[in-house]
Amino acid sequence: MRTVACAVLLACFMGCLAGAWAQSAGLEILPNSENQTKPIGRSMLLTCKPNVTNKNLISQLRWTDPSGREVPFKNPTLLKPHIFVDWLPPPGEKVLTLMIPELREADTGTYTCSALYSNTKQLSKSVHVRTIMPITWDDAPEEQYPTVNETFKIRCRVSANPPAIVNWMRDGHIVETGDRYVVEQDGLTILNVTEMDDGTYTCRAIVIATGEMALRPIRVEVHTPPQMSGALPPKLEAVEGTDFTAKCAASGKPVPRYTWIRVDTARDLTKDGDRVSADVLLGELRIREVRPEDAANYSCTAKNAAGTATATVEVTVVVRPRIGRFDNISVASGKDSEAVLECHATGSPLPAVTFRKLSNPNRYINGIQPTEDRITVDGVDSPDGRTRIGKLIISNVLRSDDGLYECIATNKGGEVKKNGHLMVEFKPSFADTPQKEVWGWEQHAVNLTCLAHSIPNATISWHFNGADLFRGREGQELQQTGYTLFGSGPRSTLQVIPFNRKMYGNYKCTATNKHGTAVHEIMLREARVPSAVLQVKMDVMTATTVTFKFFGPGNDGGLPTKNYAVQYKQDSQGWEDALNRTWPVDSPYILENLKPQTRYNFRFAAQNEVGFGPWSSQQTHTTPRISAPEEPRLLGLPLSATSGTENEVVVSPYPNRYELRWQVPADNGEPITHYSVKSCPVEKYDTEWRLLPYPCQEHKLEGQATTFQLESLQPDTHYKVEVRATNAIGNSVPGQIIVRTVKDPSQMPGVANVEDGSEGQMSSAAIVVLVVAALLLALLVVDLVCCLVWRGGLIAALCHRCCSAAKTDDSDAKIASLYSWRFPLPYCSNKEDPAMLAPAKMQQATVKIPVIEEKEPLRDGKEPVPIIKERVKRETAVDFDVKKSVSRTSFVGKDSAV
């Protein structure tokens, strides 16, 4: 009994507990709001989950739409379903979502989530979905283009739910309905648009219920229709064969595009890119290589969004002149003769025709010429009016009128030229035959030449003693006469080989053409060898050479003297053993390879084309003994011992070198072993060249040298150069020359110029500088030793002054203490030295170092050359500044390169 009661009580308790659980079970929808508001076009997600203790007791969980239909699960076959449900993971949580990817206005309503709990209790929860429409720009282009002087509405049509309020702003200010503006629901109307209305307008839409606001900036650009600027004239001319361009210019906004039309054919030239074309952007009509058929009316149309404008131009073609005929003519010269040159020219417009002679740059003028009344220029038009005939009329034609003439036709299209020839015929003339006398001799061929000028060419015949030399003579008979003919006109040469004296005489050359005859005479004379030489003088004689001067001969035999000859032998020889030497006229007459101290016999003769004349003017001379060579002749301006003017100075083109050249002198019986070249810097005093106190350069050249390169010279300096030849006997008299080098601004004084690989030599001034520098360095070392050991000398004095100054200046002492570790001065003592503390300033110490001047004179073998005058001498000293440690020399030569 007690057990039954306990069971009943337990059952009652469990029933009460189950009822309490069932009563608290429910569904929860997230977002947790009974009303959901979403804009149309947005996505939406509603989540339904059971709010129970045991979710396994939930079944039949689903969503229904406002129509009561169950919302299906997502169908994989549909790419984009409008509305569907899906489980959220994990599956055991039983969370069912309602998804709407894109809300529509028809989706407004109540959506219900329901479920069955414990198979007995129905659970449900609802949410109301309300859609709103955001501000949408239905017709509000961001760029709009009104036309000037017209009424234009700036469009701005807006849709929204709830409806939006629209107003306008410009430059931050509200635009209200006024004189020229009318604010409407779908736009802003502007009355009588002007260019000042350009700018940015803002269309503002407001929904007060939702607090939404949207702005749409609209750029307004006022367009103006095209207007021709007047750059295109009504008529234009194009020149045949050239490129033609016509430009059509119009103003407007936006920039207009252009179209060119040929009016007579209505052809759009912008679509034809061949020879005739048009540029739609630049408005240019282009015609390449204009032809006559391009003449027409052309229309240009400028067009933009605001309208069009048209202009028409008439293009005429200028046809270049052409010369069709300009014939060559022939006219005989004479008092009553007349020459007419006709030139036929065409072109549009008809060209003007004139002439000129090619040998004269000036053109003839129309009518009678002011400087030559024989010449007239005239012209007429052809009967059809398409040709201009120009005429050049020359009366009383002269031979000088012969030549080329130029016809010149000119019009707007340009100028064209053509040459024609006027041939003036005349009888023969021997004006250009210079031969009047010819010399010949036995068995020697001589040419007699005639040149006959005539038009037409003349035929030439030869006569001697009144007979025609070649009439009736041919072949072997003609050759036996000694005459040969080359050419019969207009140039003819008669070759004569005289074999007897009867062939000398007067020959006549006769030229004949249809206008007349001319005769020219040439005298053939007999030439002989020259007569004896009038006089021969011995000019220079050395041990091995002799130089002659010739005078004569008295009679050259009819031909100029070509050579002089000498026949010479030793006194002990006969003339059959004599030697000969021949020189051309006006050459150096030097006989070489003679023996020293030898007696020679000489005789002389002259030679022309015929041969040598008789030997004459016999002389006897004895060559001197062997001696030193002759003076070398320098190839340049020789030094004069008396004048010494600046014009006698040879200028080197280089600042530091000079190429010296000379002729090989006579060795006077002994071969030249070597040459000596010496160069010394000099300066001119009054009329003399004096040596400067600088070292000279000497060079010895072995062998037969004839050139030498003087190097290491100073710029802008005069040098006296000597060349001596030496043989076993001794030295020759020196050949002398003065050379001046050019200036070289890039070279520093005292520095040797090193150019072309040459090494400079150190001058005496440079040596002085090096010696002074070495002395200064030695003094500095000695003073430093004195400072370190005995604390005396210049360095010690300077150090003591620094230290004593540090005592008197506290700030300087502090600074010195900071740096004392960096610059230890063991010789810097605080001990005062009265001598060092003297207030007097230190004076510069000057050390006089004499410099020995080189006074080696150039010698000519006898007396020394004057050196330097006393007034030119300078004292040389070196100044040493103990404060600045700088040395300098007080010597500066007047013309010294250092």
Swiss-Prot record:
CDD domains associated with the record: FN3, Ig, IgI_4_MYLK-like, IgI_VEGFR_like
Residue ranges of domain Fibronectin type-III in the record: 532-626, 644-745
InterPro entries linked: Cell_Adh-Cytoskel_Orgn, FN3_dom, FN3_sf, Ig-like_dom, Ig-like_dom_sf, Ig-like_fold, Ig_I-set, Ig_sub
Keywords, comma-separated and alphabetical: Cell adhesion, Developmental protein, Differentiation, Disulfide bond, Glycoprotein, Immunoglobulin domain, Membrane, Neurogenesis, Repeat, Signal, Transmembrane, Transmembrane helix
Residues bearing attached sugar chains per UniProt: 35, 51, 149, 192, 297, 328, 447, 457, 580
UniProt subcellular location: Membrane
Cytoplasmic side: 783-898
PROSITE patterns noted in UniProt: FN3, IG_LIKE
Gene Ontology cellular component annotations, sorted alphabetically: plasma membrane
GO biological process: anatomical structure morphogenesis; cell differentiation; homophilic cell adhesion via plasma membrane adhesion molecules; nervous system development
Membrane-related topology note: Single-pass type I membrane protein
Signal peptide: 1-22
Function statement: Neuronal recognition molecule. Involved in a pathway recognition for axons during the development of nerve fascicles.
Protein name according to UniProt: Fasciclin-2
Source organism of this protein record: Schistocerca americana
